[in-house]
Each structure stands twice: as structure tokens, then as C-alpha cells.
Regions:
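Bacterial N-terminal signal peptides that target proteins for export
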Residues: 1-8
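Bacterial N-terminal signal peptides
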Residues: 9-17
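Extracellular/periplasmic carbohydrate-active domains that bind, remodel
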Residues: 19-465
Length: 465
């Protein structure tokens, strides 16, 4: 029987990073050198995988790569001062096409370009693990017990690649693209300037991200079809949504700081707890879609983008790009604070393309405080599944006067236990489509707004996010 050992270098590195220790069998350290480091690093990863598992350590300095595949039981470990620098050429990222260690079936490969018509449907390139859209600076496919760990001061830099046939005709590869993985650990590093999402994780189980920082680029952490996910003590300052995804079960987001030019959360799932998080707007980094074509091609910094307002604290998300296994329900937002978001809650089911999948059953806000809001809460539910909305021990304050706190339709129950509102001169709810039914309101300890439900004769008009 082979006995697992602790290597001294492995113990020291894990201690410095603050991440959970793992026994390692094989350790290889790679120093920074001039030129393309892809082959040297990938060969070390493959050797560790072939040996049954191990750690590949990158020393301080710049490691320029095209794309890397991290495999089962392998830890990619970045020492302090180490930087993985991605290629700006999107054609450099098709590594799964020629993988001889773990070959990928041709049926899972496509180089199809992005199209507007397919952007929200299942019948598109997102379902192919080895698609152009799923390409990433670091790839994981079907990996078990894999990890990417960085000491403080380590960086994964996507280099703002431009792809003229990528999403929205400019977005490049993802930062870390992980599909069908189990027991995935992400810890300690800073990831920035990715061509698309910093983390694209799909159909995976037991995912843990801790003390990760995401800067600029697009979505910070985007998960679909994942179970048992923990996002702890992370910082995301992004030009797109900080934490996004749907069809996720048993998700905990705790002690995170979020800053964005889009939504702090564009999310859905079952048994979701968002706890002790802080959101601040406007975004430090602008939305890259607002850059000129010339700036996108040149890889200009995200700070040049003209729009940086934070659109919402929580926007519901469910489109047709991924099968939805369970009802979206039991979402709890607890002990969170925010300042400077346009909206606090945005649910506009069926009226915009990112909210035409499965409807939301219920969401609860408990001991939350929001200041500097600019627009009422949006809550347009599904006639077949009216929304249940709960506020307990909450405070909501608006930057300028509003005519109502909530505008919406197809609401089932609104349950309030201590809610203080500032900046609203009007009812609790302004209701559209009154003939479809009036919500049942139970309000105790409501301050700053009347517990009224007032019908509206106006045309429903809420700008999509």
C-alpha cells in the first residue's frame, strides 16, 4: 500500500496561502523564464497527473502562457510574485483539440462563433465543453480533487484578449473554465483582465473559492448547474456582474466585498445563502462593452469605459442556456450592506431575455441595510407561481424620492417584520395587472411607507438589466 507523504515545500506553501492542506505525492517547481512557458508548465502538470497527483509550483516572475489544462489530483500553486500572463490571441486557446493525455471526444468540440440568435438558448456553443466560448486561460474538464492556489501577491492576468467572433463580437476566452468537476478548490490568487468571465464553472460539485480577488474583466464568479458551492472571503471588483449563475443548489456566499458596473448578484438557485457581504457602487472598473471598438482591440484598461453605475444588488437570472433541474427557491440574503446601487432587487420574469427560464418561488431579506438606492424594487412574478417576498429587520434608503417601494405584479405574499424605509412618498406596492390577483400583505413594524397596495393604470415599463 502506498503511503501519502507531506513534502516540506508543500506544507510551507499551503501555510503561506492560508488554504487547506492536502497531501501531495509529486512536486515540481518552475521558475520564471523569458518566452512562452506553456509547454514547460503543461508537461509538469501532466507528469503530476500521471504520477497519481501532485503540485506544480510557479516561482515569482511572469509565466507567459497560451492555455493550460489542470487535471485530477493536481494543484497549480502560485508563489508570491508569480504571474500567469495570458495570450491576447484567441486562437491560442484551443488546447482540448489536441490533448493526448485525456483526449476529448470530437462530439464535444466546436469552433462555432457567437451569434445573437443563440445567445439565450440551449442549442448553442455553451453546451460543448470544448467550444470556443468555453475556452479559458486555465481549463479543467472532468477533473476531481484539483486546485488552483495562490499566495498573497500572486496573479492570473488574462491580458484583455479580443475576439472579433467571440461573445458580443469582442469578448475573448474565460479566465478559469471548469466543467464537470468534483472537489475543486480555488484560493488566494488575484485574477484580472480576463477576456470573458474570470471564473466559468458548470455542472460541478463541491466547489470552494476562498480569499480570491477578481479585478476588471467581466463576471467575477459565474456558476451554472453546480451543487455544494462555497464562496468565502472573496473580493470582486468587476466591470460585469460580480457573482452570477443559475440552476445551483446549496450555495453559500459569505464575507465577500463586491463592486461592479453591473449587478452584485445576477443569480438563482435552490437553498442559497448570501451572508455578511458588502456591496459598494459605483464600479471601480467600467463595463467593457461601453469601450470603443478600437479600445477593445487594443486591450485598453476597463477604467476607460464610460458607464460604471452599479445596476442592482440582486437581479434574478434564469435563461435557456442551461437545463434547470430544481425550482428556484429558498434564497436568503442575511446581514448584508450596500450603498450606491441603482436597484436593490430586480425580478422581471418573462419581460427580459435573461429571465425567461424558470420563475422564482421565494426570496427573503433578513437584517439587510441599503442606502443610496435610485429606483424602486422590481417584482414581476409568474402568474403560475406568484412570488413570495420577505423582509425582516431591514432598512432601505433612497437617494431621491420614489413613488412606491415595490412595483410589480403576480405577487403571492409579502411578509414584513420590521422594515424601515426612507425616501418613498407613496405605497408599499404599486401593482400592475391587478385583475391577476392582489398579494397577501402581512406588515408589522413598517416605517416610512404605508402598507398599501395601489393599482397602476400605466403601462409596465422597467428597463432590463
Amino acid at each position: 500500500m502506498k503511503v501519502k507523504k507531506w513534502t516540506l515545500v508543500g506544507i510551507v506553501g499551503v501555510f503561506l496561502s492560508g488554504c487547506t492542506c492536502k497531501p501531495v505525492e509529486h512536486t515540481c517547481r518552475i521558475g520564471a523564464e523569458e518566452g512562452d512557458a506553456t509547454q514547460r508548465i503543461q508537461q509538469a502538470i501532466d507528469a503530476a497527473f500521471t504520477a497519481g497527483g501532485g503540485t506544480v509550483r510557479l516561482g515569482a516572475g511572469t509565466h507567459a502562457v497560451k492555455s493550460l489544462r489542470v487535471r485530477s489530483r493536481v494543484t497549480l500553486y502560485l508563489e508570491k510574485g508569480a504571474m500567469i500572463l495570458g495570450s491576447r490571441n484567441p486562437e491560442d486557446y484551443f488546447i482540448l483539440d489536441s490533448d493526448r493525455i485525456e483526449p476529448v471526444s470530437p462530439s464535444l468540440i466546436t469552433h462555432e462563433a457567437w451569434t445573437i440568435e443563440q445567445s439565450c438558448t440551449l442549442d448553442n456553443f455553451t453546451k460543448y465543453p470544448a467550444s470556443r466560448w468555453n475556452n479559458g486561460l486555465i481549463r479543467l474538464l472532468g477533473a476531481t480533487d484539483a486546485a488552483i492556489i495562490g499566495e498573497p501577491g500572486s496573479v492570473i492576468d488574462g491580458h484583455d484578449p479580443y475576439d472579433p467572433v467571440g461573445e458580443e463580437f469582442y469578448r475573448g476566452p474565460q479566465g478559469i473554465s471548469a466543467i464537470n468537476c468534483t472537489n475543486l478548490t480555488l484560493c488566494g490568487y488575484t485574477i484580472r483582465n480576463t477576456g470573458n468571465w474570470a471564473h466559468r464553472i458548470a455542472d460541478s460539485r463541491n466547489v470552494r473559492a476562498e480569499k480570491v480577488t477578481g479585478l476588471a474583466g467581466h463576471d467575477g464568479f459565474h456558476i451554472n448547474g453546480c451543487d455544494q458551492v462555497r464562496i468565502l472571503g472573496c473580493t470582486f471588483k468587476t466591470g460585469d456582474d460580480c457573482i452570477a449563475g443559475f440552476d445551483n443548489t446549496d450555495v453559500v456566499v459569505r464575507d465577500c466585498f463586491l463592486n461592479t458596473a453591473c449587478s452584485g448578484f445576477r443569480f438563482a438557485g435552490t437553498d442559497v445563502l448570501i451572508e455578511k457581504c458588502t456591496l459598494r457602487g459605483p464600479g471601480e472598473y467600467g463595463f467593457r462593452g461601453a469601450l470603443s471598438k478600437e479600445d477593445k482591440i487594443a486591450g485598453a484598461p476597463s477604467g476607460r469605459a464610460k458607464r460604471n453605475n452599479m445596476l442592482s444588488f440582486f437581479t434574478y437570472y434564469a435563461d435557456g442556456t442551461h437545463p434547470i433541474r430544481r425550482p428556484a427557491a429558498k434564497i436568503r440574503i442575511v446581514d448584508c450592506t450596500s450603498h450606491g446601487t441603482d436597484r436593490y432587487f430586480h425580478y422581471n420574469y418573462g419581460n427580459e431575455k435573461w429571465q425567461r427560464g424558470q420563475p422564482l418561488a421565494d426570496i427573503s431579506f433578513i437584517r439587510v441595510t441599503a442606502t443610496g438606492l435610485k429606483l424602486p424594487l422590481s417584482a414581476w412574478g409568474d402568474p403560475a407561481l406568484p412570488l413570495s417576498l420577505t423582509f425582516k429587520d431591514c432598512r432601505l434608503g433612497f437617494e431621491r424620492p420614489q413613488k412606491e417601494l415595490i412595483r410589480g405584479a403576480h405577487l403571492g405574499t409579502v411578509w414584513i417584520d420590521n422594515l424601515e424605509v426612507r425616501g418613498v412618498d407613496g405605497p408599499l406596492i404599486r401593482l400592475w395587472n391587478e385583475k391577476a390577483g392582489t398579494p397577501q400583505v402581512s406588515a408589522s413594524g413598517l416605517k416610512g411607507v404605508s402598507a398599501e397596495v395601489v393599482p397602476s393604470s400605466d403601462v409596465w415599463s422597467v428597463r432590463g438589466i
